[in-house]
Structure formats: C-alpha cells, structure tokens
Amino acid sequence: ARALALNPKFIVCDEPVSALDVSIQAQILNLLMDLQDELGITYMFITHNMSVVRHISHNICVMYLGQLVETSPTKELFSKPLHPYTKALLSAIPSTDIHHKKERIILKGELVSPIDPKPGCRFATRCPYACEACSQPQELREVLPGHYVSCCRVEELENL
C-alpha cells in the first residue's frame, strides 16, 4: 500500500505472496491485477511459483543462475517453451489433469558456482543437449515473434 502512495508506474514485486495461504495469494494477485488495470502500473514479478507467474504476467523472463535464458509472452512460453531449462522448470508444475500425465524432466549434472561462473551458458553442465558451443557466451535471439531464447541449439531442439 505504501508503494502506491507516490503513484508509481513501475513496481518490483519480489516474492510478494510466497509466505501466504493460497486463498490470500489469490486475493492479493487479483488486487494487483485490478490496480494494474486502473492505474496503468507495470510490475516486475520475481517468483519461483510458476502458477503465480502464469496468473499475473503478460510476458515472462526465465533466468538460470542470474542469466536470462528465455523471454516470451506468457501463453506462448507455457505452450511452447524452447530453452531446455524452461522445459524442465515447467515440467515440475503439478498437473491437475488426471488423464494427462506430464513427463517430469529431472536435471542431472553439476551446478555452476554463482560466485565464479564460467563463460558461456550457465545451464550447460546440467543440460542434456549441451555441446562445445555452449562454453561460449550465448546471446538472446528472437526465434519466434516476441520469443527470445539464449541457446545455440534451439532450432534443432524445437522439434524435440
């Protein structure tokens, strides 16, 4: 509420509902969305809860160890994730559909030190598709309209 006193156009929300009961989370998220419509506020939502992300966002940026790996409109990211980390992340969301069993992607490999990361893709040590090129810095590239991915193999992995 204090953040709204100055009529901001941009608010950073860092895990704003993580410690709240699910029913309270929904009320807070709905209030934030109403305020966004009424006041034209833009939010940067930082969270690990992909259900919250899906509910409140228009666009999503996925980061791995501080490195942006994918950004896309929300609906497209959930229906067609392209980066291997995003695919693994979304596979971890529990499904409520008992007729559609979702295959969970289990990540293996060693975590890169966030204190002293190597150049290149920070996900490479855990990525099942890593190749030599992954040791080089990866630029975000637009692979679909408005959908950017930081992966040198995205075109060939898109069909997997």
What are these regions (language model features)?
Residues 12-16, 20, 24-102:
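P-loop NTP-binding/switch modules centered on Walker-like glycine-rich loops
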Residues 7:
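Conserved catalytic motifs of ABC-family nucleotide-binding domains
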